[in-house]
Amino acid sequence: MGLFGKKEKKAAPSTSGKSYLDIKENKDGAEYTFLLNGRLDTITSPELDAKINEVTPDAEKLIFDLSNLDYISSAGLRVLLGATQAMEDKGEMVVRNLTEPVKEVFELTGFSRLFTIE
């Protein structure tokens, strides 16, 4: 069992052993929180994208807790941007607890202006 009482699913590491993402999901009514641990990159972003696509039909709020995210690539940014677009007419999306490396990427790319950051 995972932190939120759900079965944990983990992305398989890449052949280089460097790409790994653990996604913990919590649902509270129509609010979904995703706690990301590891790297959100080309290898791991499809798993998060699939989870987002599963919940957006019922979601009024998506929260991404990035307190344990070590790295985010352009592929990861695209997934978060897609989530923002999916929630545009339905509710809100929040990104919180950015680590320093992830915060730098958000600032350098201008994504810090696109998201609600807590």
Task: Specify the residue positions occupied by each region the protein language model found.
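Amphipathic alpha-helical interaction surfaces in cytosolic regulatory modules
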Residues: 42-114
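Short acidic-hydrophobic, aromatic-tinged amphipathic segments that line or gate anion-handling sites
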Residues: 116-118
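STAS-typified acidic loop motif
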Residues: 12-48
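Polybasic, Ser/Thr-rich amphipathic helices
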Residues: 1-8
